[in-house]
Amino acid sequence: MLKLYIRPVCLLRPEEEVASLSLLVESRREKVRTIKGKENRSRSIAAGLLLRYMLLEEQIPYAEESFGLEEHGKPRLKKDGVFFNLSHAGAYVAGVLSDVPVGVDVE
């Protein structure tokens, strides 16, 4: 399995940012809160929403307990045999879901 997703990113109004954050797991919300700059926050939120969509489409729970951290702090799924990677830059966010370790770079 290899599924690639690419979506445009739009700047969020404050009320849209609040609503979007409520759909993300707490670890992603915490990450977003540390980001300075509206554009960078919007990209990070878009990446989190894309991951949520990717997992739910595959019927994988999007919940805090579904995630762990790799050795160097990179988020990973606890579910065996499912790997993801996200990238965001400029006006796009990209995500990939696979049954083998995988990476994606939107640039």
Could you describe each region identified by the protein language model?
Residues 1-107:
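Core catalytic alpha/beta fold that binds nucleotide/phospho-ligands
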